[in-house]
């Protein structure tokens, strides 16, 4: 098949195997890279070209409060203006964590909370309400309840003012459609390793645009190779209003060259064709 037959390639890819979304994403990203190179343009421009910069948060892992405060202050000193705080294991103790971080970093830093499915619906309502009562000004709470509990997540979304972001609950366009239909969450988190790549992620973007639902683009602990593809998608689509693309910043070493530039929490797109990666090391 010729690279210009993008839809044909993607139909064949996604009909070949069930699940295995990370493997599909690897092929998908390579195809989109070649497709954009064929036309001599950066991928984000071919996908829509909404902007050439993406601001990302950085993750602060669960630790004792003093360590989390220190990690947060270090991230702010590095230039990050958005922190994503991991919680979800100790109930109201999580409120103390967020309160300590908010006091340390001040009101000018945006804070997001990721519970990673760690609460029941009732716990989530109690904890998020406590954060609201303390005026902690949380941008969003990510996946407060188990992925399968859409009824519980809908109850949380309805009960609190803080926006709720669905993550593990949304892998496919079908998942996104169900969350939108039932109003189970306010926001959708797109990850290429969940969707199977850019092709399916674009479908989620289109659904979200139709119904006025904003999206975040996220990543696992991924290298610059994979995160660069996600950054191109984020730069292309206005419906993607938030980014959690800190994977390369959390890696000990970056063996790849080329691609978007990472500067103090801002990802800057370049004019390089395709995804922009110019060297991929040989792994042994």
Predicted segment positions?
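Flexible, glycine/charged-enriched surface loops at secondary-structure junctions
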Residues: 3-7, 42-46, 138-144, 219-220, ...
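A generic structural signal for well-ordered alpha-helical segments
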Residues: 35-36, 157, 208, 234
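Flexible C-terminal active-site loop/helix
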Residues: 220-284
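N-terminal small/glycine-rich loop or linker at the start of catalytic domains
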Residues: 37-64
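Metal- or metallocofactor-binding catalytic centers and their adjacent structured scaffolds
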Residues: 1-38
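Active-site beta->alpha loop and helix N-cap motifs at the rims of alpha/beta catalytic domains
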Residues: 41, 60-69, 74, 91, ...
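Catalytic core of soluble alpha/beta enzymes
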Residues: 85-226, 252-262
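Gly-rich Lys/Arg/Thr-decorated short loops/hinges at beta-loop-alpha junctions or inter-strand turns
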Residues: 52-56, 75-82
């Amino acid at each position: 098949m010729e690279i210009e037959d993008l839809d044909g390639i993607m139909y064949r890819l996604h009909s070949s195997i069930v699940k295995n979304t990370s493997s599909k994403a690897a092929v998908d990203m390579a195809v989109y890279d070649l497709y954009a190179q064929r036309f001599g343009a950066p991928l984000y421009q071919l996908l829509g070209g909404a902007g050439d910069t993406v601001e990302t948060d950085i993750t602060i892992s669960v630790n004792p409060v003093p360590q989390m405060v220190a990690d947060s202050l270090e991230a702010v000193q590095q230039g990050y203006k958005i922190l994503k705080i991991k919680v979800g294991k100790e109930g109201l103790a999580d409120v103390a964590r967020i309160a300590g971080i908010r006091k340390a970093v001040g009101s000018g830093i945006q804070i997001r909370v990721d519970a990673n499915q760690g609460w029941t619906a009732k716990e989530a309502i109690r904890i998020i309400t406590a954060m609201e009562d303390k005026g902690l000004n949380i941008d969003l709470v990510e996946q407060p309840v188990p992925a399968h509990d859409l009824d519980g997540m809908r109850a949380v979304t309805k009960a609190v003012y803080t926006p709720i972001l669905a993550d593990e609950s949304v892998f496919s366009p079908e998942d996104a459609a169900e969350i939108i239909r039932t109003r189970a969450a306010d926001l959708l988190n797109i990850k290429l390793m969940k969707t199977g790549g850019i092709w399916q992620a674009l479908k989620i973007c289109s659904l979200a645009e139709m119904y006025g639902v904003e999206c975040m683009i996220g990543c696992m602990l991924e290298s610059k190779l994979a995160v660069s593809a996600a950054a191109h998608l984020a730069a292309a689509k206005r419906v993607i209003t938030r980014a959690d693309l800190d994977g390369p910043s959390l890696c000990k070493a970056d063996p790849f060259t080329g691609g978007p530039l990472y500067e103090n929490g801002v990802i800057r797109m370049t004019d390089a064709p395709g995804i922009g990666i110019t060297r991929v090391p040989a792994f042994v």
